[in-house]
Amino acid sequence: MSQPSTRVSRLPEKQVSSRDALFALLDSTPLATVALTRAGHPVIFPTGFARVGDELVIHGSTGSPWLRALSEGASAAVSVTTLDGIVVARSGFESSFHYRSAVLFGVFERVPDDAKARCLEKLTDKFIPGCVAELRASTRKELAATLVLRMAIGDGNWSLKVSDGWPDDPPEDVEAGVWAGVIPMSVSFGDPQRAPDCPADIPVPESVRVKTR
């Protein structure tokens, strides 16, 4: 099967070829969407991920039929997107978003057993940096029940599109005297909520306190 084109056809001036820019996006958000065809039908699912060097790593239950299909060589498309702002133009037609959006095409492969624990630690630290040092190690049973997959981030199997400009209103709208601009967006974290079975005298771990400052 031939690989889909990675050339941006709609607004091609927004395509970015910088690998560093791709890595910055992948490292900034923990959620990806994975699409594949299984039993003749398209399926898609969200999943946490981490970039480990030049590979994109996901994990899940060994009982997942979709993950098993990926581990057996099903072609996949992975989408990662973050919203950075709302572009408020002088009309609904011209209003849009600031965003960074990447799509990767390829085939996942199983991470060998001797590298599985390290990849899972990378995934955990992606979500809460520093927490791996505060947690117990995964048990053999947990590792055996977990499927860890990786996809190579090559030189030609990804596409990155970035929109970061100002409203592009026609002159007659600019002259109408209506406000236009950008509302920046960012992710923030609230105060930690203690689990009902967690005694009050157990301190909040450093990794959680840093995340929520």
Feature-to-residue mapping (PLM):
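Short, structured beta-strand-loop surface elements
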Residues: G63-K122
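C-terminal edge-of-domain segments
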Residues: M1-S5, A115-R213
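A generic structural signal for short beta-strands and their flanking turns/coil linkers
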Residues: P30, F45, V52-D54, E72-A76, ...
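An N-terminal domain-cap segment
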Residues: S2-V57, R68
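Well-ordered beta-strand positions
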Residues: G48-A50, S71, E142, A152
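A generic structural motif
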Residues: L56-G60, L149
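General beta-strand recognition
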Residues: E55-V57, A77, S159
